């Protein structure tokens, strides 16, 4: 990612510091507070399409059992807050105020199904329940929810969410980089469109594909 891409210096008359302040901001991604920030961004994008590439499986579709496992080393209060935030985000999605597109690398679902990589040691019943929940939600909410699966051997994407035409957010672990400059948002939207065009599994076929992973 070049400095010119971040700042748009070649086409902007403002001072670099002013450009950064206007187009780029950082938000701490501590899990519970980040969930509240994400919900606020989703609400802000009401009426616009939201596009999302998650870092693992989509948080918005994680079951309580999956969150219990992920938060095993955290305080119980954090799990409670996180689960409530996920429910609020799912309620927002179910309201139909915005179309939602998600692009997921196929290997993430395969790893969950087989209990390998990130999901090593996670009980099969929890993994199966998680996959079935995603498949069911994807089927019930189609077409306002569309999930596309891509081959990470051919395509790559950092975790990113584009909230309509005015905001794009990249997740970098400890913080979120958020962009509000139109050209930066447009560029990331184009990146997501590329993932969709090159997807191996189309949205219509995702529910049956996921169910086929459960053995």
Predicted region positions:
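Basic, Lys/Arg-rich alpha-helical nucleic-acid-recognition elements, primarily the DNA-binding modules
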Residues: 1-24
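Surface-exposed acidic, glycine/proline-enriched linker/cap segments
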Residues: 31-41
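Hydrophobic protein-protein interaction segments
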Residues: 42-214
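Residue-level signal for secondary-structure boundary elements
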Residues: 18, 31-32, 200-204
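Compositionally biased, low-hydrophobicity segments enriched in charged and small polar residues
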Residues: 24-31, 101-103
């Amino acid at each position: 990612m070049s400095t010119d891409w971040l700042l748009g210096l070649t086409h902007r008359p403002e001072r670099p510091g002013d450009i950064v302040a206007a187009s780029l901001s950082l938000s701490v991604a501590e899990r519970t507070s980040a969930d509240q920030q994400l919900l606020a961004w989703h609400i802000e994008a009401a009426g616009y399409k939201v596009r999302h590439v998650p870092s693992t499986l989509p948080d918005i579709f994680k079951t309580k059992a999956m969150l219990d496992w992920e938060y095993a080393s955290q305080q119980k209060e954090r799990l409670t807050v996180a689960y409530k935030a996920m429910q609020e985000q799912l309620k927002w999605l179910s309201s139909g105020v915005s179309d939602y597109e998600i692009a997921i690398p196929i290997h993430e679902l395969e790893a969950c199904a087989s209990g390998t990589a990130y999901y090593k040691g996670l009980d099969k019943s929890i993994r199966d329940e998680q996959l079935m929940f995603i498949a069911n939600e994807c089927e019930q909410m189609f077409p306002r929810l569309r999930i596309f699966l891509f081959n990470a051997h051919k395509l790559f994407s950092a975790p990113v969410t584009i909230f309509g035409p005015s905001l794009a957010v990249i997740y970098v672990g400890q913080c979120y980089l958020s962009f509000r400059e139109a050209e930066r948002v447009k560029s990331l939207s184009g990146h997501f469109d590329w993932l969709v065009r090159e997807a191996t599994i189309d949205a219509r076929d995702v529910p049956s594909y996921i169910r086929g992973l459960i053995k």
